[in-house]
Amino acid sequence: GLLLFPTATKKLRRMWAFPSILLLSIVMIFSTXLSIQQINSSSIYQYVWSWTXDNDFSLEFGYLIDPLTSIMSMLXTTVGIMVLIYSDNYMAHDQGYLIFFAYMSFFSTSMLGLVTSSNLIQIYIFWELVGMCSYLLIGFWFTRPSAANACQKAFVTNRVGDFGLLLGILGFYWITGSFEFQDLFEIFNNLIYNNQVNSPFVTLCAALLFAGAVAKSAQFPLHVWLPDAMEGPTPISALIHAATMVAAGIFLVARLLPLFIVIPYIMNFISLIGIITVLLGATLALAQKDIKRGLAYSTMSQLXYMMLALGMGSYRSALFHLITHAYSKALLFLGSGSVIHSMETIVGYSPDKSQNMVLMGGLRKHVPITKTSFLLGTLSLCGIPPLACFWSKDEILNESWLYSPIFAIIAWATAGLTAFYMFRIYLLTFEGHLNVHFQNYSGNQNASLYSISLWGKGCSKRINKNFLLLKMNNNESSSFFSKNTYRSDENVRKRNRGRPFINIVDFYNQKSFSYPYESDNTMLFPLLVLVLFTLFVGILGIPFNQEGRDLDILSKWLAPSINLLHQKSEDSTDWYEFLKNAIFSVSIASFGIFLASXLYKPIYSSFKNFDLINLFVKTGPKRSRWDKIINILYXWSYXRAYIDTFYTTSXTGAIRGLAQLTDFFDRRVIDGITNGVGVMSFFV
């Protein structure tokens, strides 16, 4: 009986996943019914009851059901259900299985409470609960120092934004005397119309409110917690990046847009932060080796597209991209979890190895379903039609030209970067050969190695056979394909007076290898469902409103909110303009995919790329300058733009120095005075 007890309890505890999934499914059914009602009737529901009442002060609690609420509740429930089903298998062997599901359910509940809130105080309460849940889940494996540090970093960074949010809430209560959204918007618009507000103070309060969204949605400069949040289990990474925590910041700005839209400086500030984050997130994703961190920086960049759209006043485009990105990014994160799960059969439980794209490659032969779903998510994020993100991102890109040509150029260029780094992740993970069998990561002298020195792929220091391909002058600077920490044997380099542009290194070994395998059905089912969303959810926002037929579902859904913002929906779509812009955006994305394929496609399986690469590779002083530029870009990307280093040396270092000074003052000065008085009294 004692021998069978652990097996029996494991099966019993997995039963507790069912109530969580069932309850969230019931909420999803209610959310779907509310969404259908709103599409048909364009209505807004609000119910409020008094929590505390006084002569001069009253605090109400209630719920507000409008298009924004129904969209966010649909996202949170549909993605949440898929993540919970996926987690049942992913976390089955974890000792904290039950507490993980408790945290996940509480996380979903907090997010649903946040999106249904009818006033700022209620939003702030659930805002803090969402932050607390993220702290618990990011640090779920708290015995690992990296996870413990990551959850503390996320908590402290979000406290900065939350403090600004609290001050902004109090500031607007001081101005309007109300926390309720409907009253707040009406009173504030009247004050603006009658010119009865202090513009600098109002702008400051609005900026403080926006600071909360900057921290929660990982916008520059409070984005530093997001890549470290990947230390948590992969299912929670999917939930945070798709439908809960980072979406909360976008939700807050969208909810308060009627307030921000009458303060021009704030709208400009929101769009500026958005465009900076768009470019920064894309450049930081270029050289990441951890598959989840690469996707995290992708999330940061895509959230900035939404923030840019909100700053431009394009409410519909921002929410459309929020919907399409949520399903595509959930698919990518759950797909990466399936990859990590399969890699653990070879490297064991070691995030440094199982998440490292250096050791991946060739997985398409072993995990074909995961590969196909990941490829569809990648194509969607790249903006390839007819997948979901193509429709929403194109809308933002087109509207950016009307707002600012400079912002538009950056946004369009970043679309090409997005295609480049996403296909880099895909190619390093699924194409070529399984590099874990050719990497000497275990320290064995007989380990096989068959590697290409690329961004994201290393070259051994021990070389038996060195095929020199595409030789170039031996300069101190390394090439685009290599980082100077990945060096060939020095004697080989001196003997050949050149560094190989591509090193192919081969070791022979009689050892038999194990191979990854496809995940179980409970992990594949959510992937297939999210594939369907990725394929078809874009239909919601396609502007089919020609010849008197209005089939634009998203515009009908958002009609009450758009009317509140005093915006007009376009009656018809200029299909010539649409096709022209679509062809341009797809061309940019295709160019990014082409570059990624040329640089990261496995060379050892196709030597046809050499002639193409030779067109771009020439020796001489110009090549040396190009290598320096590439090294600077690599160091910028891999070192996270040095922002973490700056915070560590300036903010963290200053706080620690102040703490040490305070400790010295307490021990030496305060205690010294006390002890001195005691000694003096002894002599007296």
UniProtKB/Swiss-Prot annotation:
EC number: 7.1.1.-
Localization per Swiss-Prot or TrEMBL: Plastid, Chloroplast thylakoid membrane
Alphabetically ordered keywords of this record: Chloroplast, Membrane, NAD, NADP, Plastid, Plastoquinone, Quinone, Thylakoid, Translocase, Transmembrane, Transmembrane helix, Transport
Stretches that traverse the bilayer: 16-36, 65-85, 96-116, 123-143, 161-181, 206-226, 234-254, 256-276, 303-323, 330-350, 372-392, 401-421, 524-544, 583-603
Keyword Transmembrane: yes
Membrane disposition: Multi-pass membrane protein
Database matches in Pfam families: Proton_antipo_C, Proton_antipo_M, Proton_antipo_N
GO terms, biological process: ATP synthesis coupled electron transport; electron transport coupled proton transport
EC class: translocase
Molecular function GO labels: NADH dehydrogenase (ubiquinone) activity; quinone binding
InterPro entries: NADH_UbQ_OxRdtase_chlpt_su5_C, NADHpl_OxRdtase_5_subgr, ND/Mrp_TM, NU5C-like, Proton_antipo_N
Single GO cellular component term: chloroplast thylakoid membrane
Domain of life (superkingdom): Eukaryota
Family assignment from sequence similarity: Belongs to the complex I subunit 5 family.
Function in brief: NDH shuttles electrons from NAD(P)H:plastoquinone, via FMN and iron-sulfur (Fe-S) centers, to quinones in the photosynthetic chain and possibly in a chloroplast respiratory chain. The immediate electron acceptor for the enzyme in this species is believed to be plastoquinone. Couples the redox reaction to proton translocation, and thus conserves the redox energy in a proton gradient.
NCBIfam families for this protein: NDH_I_L, PRK06590.1
Subunit structure: NDH is composed of at least 16 different subunits, 5 of which are encoded in the nucleus.
Protein known as: NAD(P)H-quinone oxidoreductase subunit 5, chloroplastic
Organism: Sesamum indicum
Protein's gene: ndhF
